[in-house]
Amino acid sequence: MNKHDPIVGRYVYITCQGKTYRTYYEENGEGIPMVCLHTAGSDGRQYRHQLCDPDISANFRTIVFDVPRHGKSLPPAGWHLEEDEYKLTTSFYAEFIVEFCRALELHKPVIMGQSMGGNICLELALRYENEFSALIALEACDHSPGWWIDPLHHPEIHGGEAVATAVFGLMSPESPDEYRWETWWYYAQGGPGIFKGDLYYYSVDSDYRDKVHKISGKVPIYFLTGEYDFACTPEMTMRTAEKVKNSECIIFGGGHFPTSEDPDKFKEVITPVLKKILQNDPGRRGSATENWSSNRSSSGGGRPSDDAPRRRVIDL
Protein backbone atom coordinates (compact mmCIF):
# COMPACT_ATOMS: atom_id res chain seq x y z
CA MET A 1 0.00 0.00 0.00
CA ASN A 2 1.28 3.47 -0.84
CA LYS A 3 2.44 5.69 1.98
CA HIS A 4 0.26 8.61 3.05
CA ASP A 5 1.25 11.53 5.24
CA PRO A 6 -1.06 12.01 8.25
CA ILE A 7 -1.67 15.67 7.39
CA VAL A 8 -5.23 16.87 6.76
CA GLY A 9 -5.87 20.09 4.81
CA ARG A 10 -8.97 22.30 4.91
CA TYR A 11 -10.17 25.80 4.11
CA VAL A 12 -11.69 28.24 6.56
CA TYR A 13 -13.11 31.67 5.82
CA ILE A 14 -11.53 34.41 7.94
CA THR A 15 -12.82 37.98 8.04
CA CYS A 16 -10.17 40.52 8.96
CA GLN A 17 -10.23 44.30 8.61
CA GLY A 18 -13.36 44.26 6.48
CA LYS A 19 -12.40 41.55 3.97
CA THR A 20 -12.99 37.81 3.91
CA TYR A 21 -10.15 35.43 3.07
CA ARG A 22 -10.48 31.80 2.02
CA THR A 23 -7.63 30.47 4.09
CA TYR A 24 -5.92 27.12 3.67
CA TYR A 25 -4.54 25.26 6.65
CA GLU A 26 -3.15 21.83 7.46
CA GLU A 27 -3.10 20.01 10.76
CA ASN A 28 -2.19 16.81 12.53
CA GLY A 29 -2.01 15.55 16.08
CA GLU A 30 -3.80 15.95 19.38
CA GLY A 31 -3.19 17.82 22.59
CA ILE A 32 -2.09 21.42 23.01
CA PRO A 33 -2.95 23.44 19.88
CA MET A 34 0.17 24.88 18.25
CA VAL A 35 -0.25 27.30 15.33
CA CYS A 36 2.82 27.63 13.11
CA LEU A 37 3.63 30.70 11.03
CA HIS A 38 5.69 30.52 7.84
CA THR A 39 8.35 32.95 6.68
CA ALA A 40 7.96 35.92 4.34
CA GLY A 41 7.19 34.95 0.75
CA SER A 42 6.74 31.25 1.46
CA ASP A 43 3.91 29.06 2.79
CA GLY A 44 2.99 26.34 5.24
CA ARG A 45 4.94 23.60 3.47
CA GLN A 46 7.90 24.75 5.56
CA TYR A 47 6.36 22.81 8.46
CA ARG A 48 5.62 19.54 6.67
CA HIS A 49 8.21 17.64 8.69
CA GLN A 50 6.86 18.83 12.03
CA LEU A 51 3.31 18.04 10.96
CA CYS A 52 4.36 14.45 10.28
CA ASP A 53 6.48 13.98 13.39
CA PRO A 54 4.86 11.35 15.65
CA ASP A 55 6.47 12.72 18.82
CA ILE A 56 5.07 16.18 18.20
CA SER A 57 1.67 14.96 17.04
CA ALA A 58 1.30 12.78 20.14
CA ASN A 59 1.12 15.87 22.33
CA PHE A 60 0.38 18.84 20.09
CA ARG A 61 -2.36 19.58 17.62
CA THR A 62 -0.06 21.24 15.09
CA ILE A 63 -1.79 23.65 12.71
CA VAL A 64 -0.18 25.55 9.85
CA PHE A 65 -2.01 28.12 7.72
CA ASP A 66 -1.01 29.96 4.57
CA VAL A 67 -1.18 33.72 5.08
CA PRO A 68 -3.54 35.30 2.49
CA ARG A 69 -1.83 35.60 -0.93
CA HIS A 70 0.54 32.75 -0.03
CA GLY A 71 0.42 29.07 -0.95
CA LYS A 72 -3.18 27.90 -1.33
CA SER A 73 -4.69 30.98 0.35
CA LEU A 74 -5.89 33.25 -2.44
CA PRO A 75 -5.86 37.04 -2.36
CA PRO A 76 -9.19 38.67 -1.50
CA ALA A 77 -11.72 39.18 -4.28
CA GLY A 78 -10.88 42.25 -6.34
CA TRP A 79 -7.18 42.18 -5.58
CA HIS A 80 -6.42 42.94 -9.24
CA LEU A 81 -8.10 46.34 -8.83
CA GLU A 82 -5.91 47.42 -5.93
CA GLU A 83 -4.04 50.61 -6.77
CA ASP A 84 -1.35 50.27 -4.12
CA GLU A 85 1.28 47.55 -4.04
CA TYR A 86 0.84 44.79 -1.49
CA LYS A 87 2.30 45.55 1.93
CA LEU A 88 1.82 43.32 4.94
CA THR A 89 1.21 45.46 8.01
CA THR A 90 1.69 44.70 11.68
CA SER A 91 -1.96 45.35 12.51
CA PHE A 92 -3.32 43.06 9.79
CA TYR A 93 -0.87 40.25 10.46
CA ALA A 94 -1.46 40.16 14.21
CA GLU A 95 -5.23 40.50 13.89
CA PHE A 96 -5.39 37.78 11.25
CA ILE A 97 -3.52 35.33 13.47
CA VAL A 98 -5.91 36.02 16.34
CA GLU A 99 -8.99 35.72 14.10
CA PHE A 100 -7.71 32.43 12.69
CA CYS A 101 -7.27 30.99 16.18
CA ARG A 102 -10.73 32.16 17.17
CA ALA A 103 -12.28 30.71 14.02
CA LEU A 104 -10.88 27.29 14.92
CA GLU A 105 -11.97 27.82 18.56
CA LEU A 106 -8.46 27.21 19.85
CA HIS A 107 -8.04 27.77 23.58
CA LYS A 108 -4.74 29.46 24.43
CA PRO A 109 -2.70 27.92 21.61
CA VAL A 110 1.06 27.97 21.35
CA ILE A 111 2.34 30.12 18.49
CA MET A 112 5.53 29.08 16.71
CA GLY A 113 6.71 31.33 13.91
CA GLN A 114 9.94 31.86 12.02
CA SER A 115 11.41 35.03 10.51
CA MET A 116 8.43 37.39 10.08
CA GLY A 117 6.40 34.75 11.92
CA GLY A 118 8.89 34.99 14.75
CA ASN A 119 8.94 38.77 14.87
CA ILE A 120 5.15 38.93 15.11
CA CYS A 121 5.40 36.97 18.36
CA LEU A 122 6.59 40.21 19.96
CA GLU A 123 3.45 42.00 18.77
CA LEU A 124 1.27 39.15 20.03
CA ALA A 125 2.96 39.33 23.42
CA LEU A 126 2.34 43.07 23.58
CA ARG A 127 -1.28 43.12 22.39
CA TYR A 128 -2.77 39.66 22.91
CA GLU A 129 -0.98 38.06 25.84
CA ASN A 130 -4.23 36.59 27.18
CA GLU A 131 -4.85 34.67 23.95
CA PHE A 132 -1.79 32.39 24.04
CA SER A 133 -0.02 29.96 26.38
CA ALA A 134 3.49 30.21 24.90
CA LEU A 135 5.32 31.88 22.01
CA ILE A 136 8.20 30.29 20.09
CA ALA A 137 10.04 32.91 18.03
CA LEU A 138 12.40 31.33 15.50
CA GLU A 139 15.00 33.57 13.84
CA ALA A 140 13.39 36.62 15.45
CA CYS A 141 14.51 39.94 16.88
CA ASP A 142 13.16 43.39 17.67
CA HIS A 143 14.20 44.97 14.35
CA SER A 144 15.28 43.51 10.98
CA PRO A 145 16.18 46.48 8.73
CA GLY A 146 17.28 46.61 5.13
CA TRP A 147 15.25 43.90 3.38
CA TRP A 148 12.43 45.92 1.81
CA ILE A 149 14.10 46.61 -1.55
CA ASP A 150 12.80 47.22 -5.09
CA PRO A 151 14.76 44.50 -6.97
CA LEU A 152 12.61 41.89 -5.24
CA HIS A 153 9.70 43.00 -7.47
CA HIS A 154 10.96 44.39 -10.76
CA PRO A 155 9.65 43.82 -14.33
CA GLU A 156 13.13 42.98 -15.63
CA ILE A 157 13.90 40.44 -12.93
CA HIS A 158 12.44 36.93 -12.64
CA GLY A 159 10.82 37.36 -9.26
CA GLY A 160 10.60 33.72 -8.22
CA GLU A 161 14.17 32.75 -9.04
CA ALA A 162 15.60 36.03 -7.74
CA VAL A 163 13.77 35.74 -4.44
CA ALA A 164 14.61 32.07 -3.96
CA THR A 165 18.27 32.60 -4.75
CA ALA A 166 18.44 35.70 -2.54
CA VAL A 167 17.42 33.69 0.51
CA PHE A 168 19.49 30.60 -0.31
CA GLY A 169 22.53 32.04 1.43
CA LEU A 170 20.56 32.42 4.65
CA MET A 171 20.62 28.65 5.08
CA SER A 172 23.34 26.75 6.86
CA PRO A 173 25.96 25.14 4.58
CA GLU A 174 25.66 22.12 6.85
CA SER A 175 21.96 21.62 6.07
CA PRO A 176 21.20 18.73 3.69
CA ASP A 177 21.13 19.76 0.03
CA GLU A 178 17.81 17.99 -0.44
CA TYR A 179 16.08 20.26 2.04
CA ARG A 180 17.92 23.44 1.12
CA TRP A 181 16.76 23.10 -2.46
CA GLU A 182 13.26 22.19 -1.31
CA THR A 183 13.20 25.46 0.62
CA TRP A 184 14.45 27.25 -2.51
CA TRP A 185 11.53 25.73 -4.45
CA TYR A 186 8.96 27.11 -2.02
CA TYR A 187 10.26 30.61 -2.59
CA ALA A 188 10.39 30.24 -6.36
CA GLN A 189 6.63 29.70 -6.38
CA GLY A 190 5.56 32.87 -4.58
CA GLY A 191 3.14 35.36 -6.15
CA PRO A 192 4.50 38.53 -7.77
CA GLY A 193 5.46 41.14 -5.22
CA ILE A 194 4.46 39.02 -2.25
CA PHE A 195 7.93 38.52 -0.80
CA LYS A 196 8.71 42.21 -1.06
CA GLY A 197 5.32 43.08 0.45
CA ASP A 198 5.95 40.78 3.40
CA LEU A 199 9.30 42.42 3.94
CA TYR A 200 7.55 45.74 4.42
CA TYR A 201 6.30 44.30 7.69
CA TYR A 202 9.61 42.58 8.41
CA SER A 203 11.92 45.56 7.87
CA VAL A 204 9.74 48.67 8.11
CA ASP A 205 6.56 48.12 10.11
CA SER A 206 7.89 45.94 12.92
CA ASP A 207 10.38 48.00 14.87
CA TYR A 208 10.04 46.83 18.48
CA ARG A 209 13.29 48.26 19.86
CA ASP A 210 11.46 50.72 22.09
CA LYS A 211 8.60 48.35 22.89
CA VAL A 212 9.91 44.95 23.94
CA HIS A 213 10.67 46.09 27.49
CA LYS A 214 6.91 46.59 27.88
CA ILE A 215 6.20 42.88 27.41
CA SER A 216 4.83 41.76 30.78
CA GLY A 217 6.28 38.25 30.81
CA LYS A 218 2.88 36.67 31.39
CA VAL A 219 3.44 34.45 28.36
CA PRO A 220 6.80 32.65 28.09
CA ILE A 221 8.74 33.42 24.93
CA TYR A 222 11.38 31.07 23.54
CA PHE A 223 13.83 32.60 21.06
CA LEU A 224 15.75 30.19 18.81
CA THR A 225 18.20 31.43 16.18
CA GLY A 226 20.71 29.67 13.94
CA GLU A 227 24.30 30.84 13.93
CA TYR A 228 24.39 31.01 10.11
CA ASP A 229 21.47 33.44 9.90
CA PHE A 230 22.66 36.88 8.79
CA ALA A 231 19.16 38.36 8.39
CA CYS A 232 18.60 37.85 12.11
CA THR A 233 21.96 37.17 13.66
CA PRO A 234 22.42 35.45 17.01
CA GLU A 235 23.56 38.79 18.40
CA MET A 236 20.32 40.46 17.27
CA THR A 237 18.25 37.75 18.92
CA MET A 238 20.25 37.76 22.14
CA ARG A 239 20.02 41.54 22.38
CA THR A 240 16.24 41.28 22.04
CA ALA A 241 15.85 38.44 24.51
CA GLU A 242 17.81 40.34 27.13
CA LYS A 243 15.02 42.93 27.18
CA VAL A 244 12.10 40.48 27.28
CA LYS A 245 10.81 39.18 30.60
CA ASN A 246 10.22 35.44 31.00
CA SER A 247 12.20 34.58 27.88
CA GLU A 248 14.82 32.05 26.92
CA CYS A 249 17.33 32.41 24.08
CA ILE A 250 18.77 29.37 22.33
CA ILE A 251 21.49 29.65 19.68
CA PHE A 252 22.16 26.57 17.56
CA GLY A 253 24.03 25.50 14.45
CA GLY A 254 21.43 26.26 11.80
CA GLY A 255 20.17 28.81 9.31
CA HIS A 256 17.19 31.10 8.78
CA PHE A 257 14.70 28.33 7.85
CA PRO A 258 15.26 25.68 10.52
CA THR A 259 11.97 23.80 10.13
CA SER A 260 12.51 23.08 6.44
CA GLU A 261 16.26 23.30 5.78
CA ASP A 262 17.30 20.79 8.44
CA PRO A 263 14.27 19.22 10.16
CA ASP A 264 16.29 16.60 12.04
CA LYS A 265 18.56 19.17 13.66
CA PHE A 266 15.58 21.39 14.38
CA LYS A 267 13.86 18.54 16.20
CA GLU A 268 16.86 18.20 18.52
CA VAL A 269 16.64 21.89 19.35
CA ILE A 270 12.87 22.29 19.64
CA THR A 271 12.16 19.09 21.61
CA PRO A 272 13.32 20.45 25.01
CA VAL A 273 11.21 23.57 24.43
CA LEU A 274 8.10 21.57 23.62
CA LYS A 275 8.70 19.37 26.65
CA LYS A 276 8.79 22.43 28.88
CA ILE A 277 5.51 23.64 27.42
CA LEU A 278 4.00 20.22 28.17
CA GLN A 279 5.32 20.29 31.71
CA ASN A 280 3.73 23.69 32.26
CA ASP A 281 0.39 22.55 30.81
CA PRO A 282 0.05 18.82 31.62
CA GLY A 283 -3.72 18.83 31.49
CA ARG A 284 -3.76 19.33 27.74
CA ARG A 285 -1.16 16.81 26.61
CA GLY A 286 -2.19 14.16 24.11
CA SER A 287 -3.07 10.58 24.93
CA ALA A 288 0.16 8.97 23.68
CA THR A 289 2.85 10.38 25.95
CA GLU A 290 5.34 7.51 26.32
CA ASN A 291 8.13 9.15 24.32
CA TRP A 292 7.76 12.58 25.91
CA SER A 293 7.07 11.74 29.53
CA SER A 294 7.67 14.62 31.91
CA ASN A 295 9.71 12.17 34.02
CA ARG A 296 12.36 11.80 31.35
CA SER A 297 15.28 14.21 31.32
CA SER A 298 15.31 17.13 28.92
CA SER A 299 17.92 19.77 28.21
CA GLY A 300 17.67 22.68 30.59
CA GLY A 301 14.96 21.28 32.90
CA GLY A 302 12.07 23.45 34.05
CA ARG A 303 11.72 27.20 33.86
CA PRO A 304 13.31 29.11 36.75
CA SER A 305 11.10 30.84 39.26
CA ASP A 306 12.26 34.34 38.26
CA ASP A 307 11.36 35.96 34.97
CA ALA A 308 14.90 36.85 33.86
CA PRO A 309 15.89 35.96 30.29
CA ARG A 310 18.18 32.97 29.86
CA ARG A 311 20.58 32.03 27.09
CA ARG A 312 21.72 28.60 26.00
CA VAL A 313 24.03 27.70 23.14
CA ILE A 314 23.50 24.27 21.62
CA ASP A 315 26.43 22.92 19.62
CA LEU A 316 24.90 20.71 16.94
Each language-model region and where it sits:
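N-terminal cap/lid segment of alpha/beta-hydrolase-fold proteins
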Residues: 2-22
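Active-site loop/oxyanion-hole signature of alpha/beta-hydrolase fold enzymes
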Residues: 17-18, 63-112, 268
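Conserved alpha/beta-hydrolase "nucleophile elbow" surrounding the catalytic nucleophile
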Residues: 38-40, 109, 113-115
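Conserved alpha/beta-hydrolase catalytic His-Asp/Glu region
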Residues: 146, 159-217
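Conserved serine/cysteine hydrolase catalytic core
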Residues: 200-242, 253, 259
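Catalytic active-site module of serine/aspartate enzymes centered on a nucleophile-bearing elbow/loop
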Residues: 246-316
